[in-house]
Amino acid sequence: MYKHPWLPNLDLIDEMLKEIGVNSLDELFNDIPAEIKINRLLNVAKGKPLSEYEIEKEINEKVKKNVELQAPPFIGAGICPHYIPNVVKFIIGRSEFYTSYTPYQPEISQGLLQALFEYQSLMAELLDMDVVNASMYDWGSALAEAVLMANRINGKKTVLVPENANPFHKEVVRTWIGGKGIKIEEVKYDKNSGELDLEDLEKKSNIDDISAIYIQQPNFFGIFESNIEHVIDVAKHKRALSIVGVNLLSLGLIKPPGSYEADIVVGDGQELGLPLNFGGPLMGVFAVRWDMSLVRQMPGRIVGITKDTNGKMGFTLILQTREQFIKREKATSNITTNEALLAIANAVYLSLLGKEGMRELAEEIYFRSHYAAKKLTEIDNVSMPFRSDFFEEFAIRFPIEYDKISNKLKERKLQGGLKLSDYTSLFCVTEVHDKKSIDLLVSTIQEMINGVETS
């Protein structure tokens, strides 16, 4: 009888093989070509099951390889470090939320549905949008769903996307639209301001097949797009849908997308109470204005409020015929429950901050990021490639290769910015970067540059 060192209940394998009339596992997998089968033992762990003590010892050895940084990481690219109030962790750690998710008889879980309804309401107020779903996987998947949604609504095949939008989000979109016949056309940005090139936008939009126009606010370089309302007008003129990707914390300072009549809004709730953890988990935000042609095509779940037969208020999933409750090929998406727990974390975070707290936090981030940029550009031959105003993230150009600077920072247990080119890096500064941390970054870089220039 076949034995496997890792899987329990293996006596059942013989019973199952006998039931289906197959003599062995080799016979069962006979249709798989021999050249792609692995005919050797895999080098898994120690080659045998480990005891609890051995597993704990192995993990601790790996943990020792972690480097404790002297300051919060200065790398962002859309995923930035923020302080998370302990009450956020406490509430989502409660078993009612942490071990549960919306079941397929969702009305049984009234508490969870109400929490998600509160998330939708708070996010709708923040964005000034009418309808928000109960969450997506992340910004990239939300943007991809927005592109697919636009195609379903108007049947057009070309989507205009800025070159200065987050490249990681664009890669997700390209993956999701593969085989759909949808074309991504990139719009250039002004190399001096860092903002979208309006002339190129007019040129690229001069066709009848525009399904949607996307713009990110602030853009990938952290720069505020001052002409965003003009972009929305271009989309209206072309009878295309406007999609706005927005940094949620920046809304403490700038106008929300609903105020300039965006059709679809996407973003990421990572900024609102979620940790950094190998890039996840993230929490995609998806909102639309009040138009049933949009609402009916929204991906994801929507929690609504109603009354039962006794007149009591209750919460329910609404418009379920859009979702995976119907045939998969007819559903607008199959996103399922996804990031419900993290949506609740967002709701708790927003409730704690309130309007004034959001503004104060956004101002803190704005001033700290500008302080860091100012101190860095005081170093000889260090400059900013773009002249426009920015929030949280900013690009810095150096007189020496950034790889050398990055290596020096790592030696000092500092995580620098994201390399954009040989001499340019994108830095991130938030409320967790105090003056001491910023000054340490600046002095280390200055020492590195001065040492190279004098050698």
From Swiss-Prot:
Q: Which InterPro entries match?
A: GcvPA (IPR023010), GDC-P_N (IPR049315), GDC_P (IPR020581), PyrdxlP-dep_Trfase (IPR015424), PyrdxlP-dep_Trfase_major (IPR015421), PyrdxlP-dep_Trfase_small (IPR015422)
**CDD domains under this entry?**
GDC-P
The keyword Coiled coil is assigned to this record: no
Biological process, per Gene Ontology: glycine decarboxylation via glycine cleavage system; nucleoside metabolic process
Q: Which residues cross the membrane?
A: none
Per the entry, what this protein does is: The glycine cleavage system catalyzes the degradation of glycine. The P protein binds the alpha-amino group of glycine through its pyridoxal phosphate cofactor; CO(2) is released and the remaining methylamine moiety is then transferred to the lipoamide cofactor of the H protein.
Q: What is the main EC category here?
A: oxidoreductase
Q: Which organism is it from?
A: Saccharolobus islandicus (strain M.16.27) (Sulfolobus islandicus)
Sequence similarity:
Belongs to the GcvP family. N-terminal subunit subfamily.
EC number, UniProt record = 1.4.4.2
Describe, as the record does, how this protein assembles with itself and its partners: The glycine cleavage system is composed of four proteins: P, T, L and H. In this organism, the P 'protein' is a heterodimer of two subunits.
User: What is an example of a GO molecular function annotated in this UniProt entry?
Assistant: glycine dehydrogenase (decarboxylating) activity
Name of the featured protein: Probable glycine dehydrogenase (decarboxylating) subunit 1
- Name the PANTHER family on file: GLYCINE CLEAVAGE SYSTEM P-PROTEIN, GLYCINE DEHYDROGENASE (DECARBOXYLATING)
Catalysed reaction, written as an equation? N(6)-[(R)-lipoyl]-L-lysyl-[glycine-cleavage complex H protein] + glycine + H(+) = N(6)-[(R)-S(8)-aminomethyldihydrolipoyl]-L-lysyl-[glycine-cleavage complex H protein] + CO2
